[in-house]
Amino acid sequence: MTGTATNAELTERWQGALMNNYGTPRLPLVRGAGTRLWDADGKEYLDFVGGIAVNALGHAHPAIVEAVSTQIASLGHVSNLFVAEPPVALAERLLQLFGRDGRVYFCNSGAEANEAAFKIGRLTGRSHMVATQGGFHGRTMGALALTGQPGKQEPFLPLPGDVTHVPYGDAQALAAAVTEETALVVIEPIQGENGVVVPPAGYLKAARAITAATGSLLVLDEVQTGIGRTGHWFEYQAHEGVLPDVVTLAKGLGGGLPLGATVAFGRAAELLQPGHHGTTFGGNPIACAAGLAVLETIQAEGLLENVKSASEKLRDGIESLGHPLIAHVRGSGLLLGIVLTEPLAPQAQQAAQDAGFLVNAPAPDVVRLMPPLNLGDDEVDAFLRALPGVLDAVTNGDGRAKE
């Protein structure tokens, strides 16, 4: 039975058949096209969540549909016992975008990409690792050990590894924690799941200097910021003089298909050897064909520039509203956080949904926007027109929560 259930019926079926690790999702969706989605009852929404920064080209983009359809009709899955052309081509293209010699390991998600980075760190012969408070790197055990959110870790203690967590953006704390016994330091250029937190200027450059001095690897988790999300192919490229040893990718790379990558350079690129790591589905030709289509379309359609212009229009428009519930906007490109003066983000998320806009509340006082990279002016204008009413719906008109 598909395609005929109502919102209520589909939600009830979810609750009866799927594990409760996500709780009950807030909305059943059945169709998408471009920046728009439709629920099972036929209501239309503008998508400012983008599958949590996954749908770089929106929904049902012709380039991805064609690439996937063509690939599955010729070669679907062969495993890593054999060579297929799409993963080779995608790895080569990624290395071109990095502008450096290196090697790529393909997997299926950001957590898996960070697990591979964890193992690369162990293969240096050192075991100590440094990550940041508030950071999010995934929920598998190694990635969870790196994640700096105790609430997510607590049910699964003890976790693997000797990991020290330091305040995000604090270069002095980082320097104090990193020693010649430190295998790697892992940092998100922007903390997405922690509420779109941007570090101080010079932080990544300082991290590079600190790790270089101790011979530690610098791992940048670009799972959320990579693949054009911030107006650069990779966010670290906006920071002069920063060359990481490892970059982890996922989300936008597959454009909606499960695809992650761990990209390593220099000595880090040579550490994984046969038998050290692997995944049956990693480098799947269909997912890699989609990844190639994403990269080609971003370049062909000038989407890096579109991200910058759409971001500027969104940020300026939101801040110019002068709404008492808006404190400021932070982030980069089309990864933006509307910081509220009151912890009303979950209520604002629901009010936006009621108004036909899908947004996300990663923190009590932050509304996160992660729309497709091809977001148009009309969609930006529609969001800006609706936002005051959305915020008014959860306040008394003075920025304070309704009783």
Curated annotation (Swiss-Prot):
It holds the Pfam family Aminotran_3. Its cofactor is pyridoxal 5'-phosphate. It is an enzyme of class 2 (transferase). Binds 1 pyridoxal phosphate per subunit. The keyword Cytoplasm applies. PROSITE patterns: AA_TRANSFER_CLASS_3 (PS00600). Pathway: Amino-acid biosynthesis; L-arginine biosynthesis; N(2)-acetyl-L-ornithine from L-glutamate: step 4/4. Pyridoxal 5'-phosphate binds at G110, A111, F136, D221, E222, V223, Q224, T280. It is found in: Cytoplasm. Keywords: Amino-acid biosynthesis, Aminotransferase, Arginine biosynthesis, Cytoplasm, Pyridoxal phosphate, Transferase. Its EC number is 2.6.1.11. The modification N6-(pyridoxal phosphate)lysine is found at K251. One of its GO terms (molecular function) is identical protein binding. One of its GO terms (biological process) is L-arginine biosynthetic process. N(2)-acetyl-L-ornithine binds at R139, T279. It catalyses: N(2)-acetyl-L-ornithine + 2-oxoglutarate = N-acetyl-L-glutamate 5-semialdehyde + L-glutamate. GO terms for cellular component: cytoplasm. May also have succinyldiaminopimelate aminotransferase activity, thus carrying out the corresponding step in lysine biosynthesis. Homodimer. Belongs to the class-III pyridoxal-phosphate-dependent aminotransferase family. ArgD subfamily. This is Acetylornithine aminotransferase.
